[in-house]
Amino acid sequence: MPELPEVEIISNFLFDKIKNKQISGVTVNNWNLRVPITQNIDDVIKGKVINNIKRRGKYIIWHIDNDIVVTVHLGMSGKLIYAKGEQAQNKHDHVIFSFSDNTSIIFNDPRKFGLVIILNKEQEVNFFNDFGIEPFTDEFNGDYLQKLLKSKKVNIKSALMNNKLIVGIGNIYASESLFRARISPLRSAQDLTYKECEKLATEIKNTLSDAIIAGGSTLKDYAQPSGSVGYFQNSFYVYGKVQKPCKICNNTITLIRQNGRSTYFCNACQN
């Protein structure tokens, strides 16, 4: 699943390519994603102009004329593909947004876990009302993180992946951030010291920033709308490295399951 860095990259690309463009039409080839696509989507947004594009957590948000909000989530395998001119449609091209300059954005999702819905401004506020803090905000620091975690009895990795606490951090970046902070994913979130929270908040920001600079992590499905892939996977310390030597201490990387998810860490480096 694309996490914060990948969604940030896609949002920035779309901001550069389709902001201020007029939508000439929407073609829906498959209405039945995990949340059904808004039925009258073409009627609602055809002829309208995209005023802004932003990210909230792992969601891509298009602000359109008349307080219309197109909300997109890529699910497990979704992509937004930028195309010029007529394109042969592929099997999993579920939604095609066409623009007046003969370009288009194609929502392609083999596993159909993605989401494309229309909201108004009030619905947008309600939709994101219980989302947690954005990691790149100034407010997100050691003091904030310690206060956030002080009553959380779950393991720290699960806490980092809880969208109601902190948005955008999935399995990859939780594992990598914890390694950089030298904190074991087995630790109880509420037991972290202030210094550990300070270090963790810093390393979360550093890890996410480094991933964005590297174009994201391409393991299976992720690609930028241009078709370019990411390279941050080449910088992983622990994720996907089971039975391989730690880059820091040469100890073997361990794989366990936490809440049904794979967790990779170094027993020697992370305490």
UniProtKB/Swiss-Prot annotation:
Cofactor or coenzyme needed: Zn(2+)
Metal-binding among keywords: yes
Record InterPro entries: DNA_glyclase/AP_lyase_DNA-bd, DNA_glyclase_Znf_dom_DNA_BS, Formamido-pyr_DNA_Glyclase, FPG_cat, MutM-like_N-ter, Ribosomal_uS13-like_H2TH, Znf_DNA_glyclase/AP_lyase, Znf_FPG/IleRS
UniProt feature coiled coil, ranges: none
Disulfide-bond pairs as recorded: none
Keywords tagged on the record: DNA damage, DNA repair, DNA-binding, Glycosidase, Hydrolase, Lyase, Metal-binding, Multifunctional enzyme, Zinc, Zinc-finger
Molecular function GO labels: 8-oxo-7,8-dihydroguanine DNA N-glycosylase activity; class I DNA-(apurinic or apyrimidinic site) endonuclease activity; damaged DNA binding; zinc ion binding
Source species, domain of life: Bacteria
Biological-process GO terms, alphabetical: base-excision repair
One Pfam family matching this protein: zf-FPG_IleRS
Binding site for DNA: H92, R111, K152
Reactions mediated catalytically: Hydrolysis of DNA containing ring-opened 7-methylguanine residues, releasing 2,6-diamino-4-hydroxy-5-(N-methyl)formamidopyrimidine; 2'-deoxyribonucleotide-(2'-deoxyribose 5'-phosphate)-2'-deoxyribonucleotide-DNA = a 3'-end 2'-deoxyribonucleotide-(2,3-dehydro-2,3-deoxyribose 5'-phosphate)-DNA + a 5'-end 5'-phospho-2'-deoxyribonucleoside-DNA + H(+)
Active site per database record: P2 (schiff-base intermediate with dna), E3 (proton donor), K58 (proton donor), R261 (proton donor)
Family: Belongs to the FPG family.
Full protein name: Formamidopyrimidine-DNA glycosylase
Organism: Wolbachia sp. subsp. Brugia malayi (strain TRS)
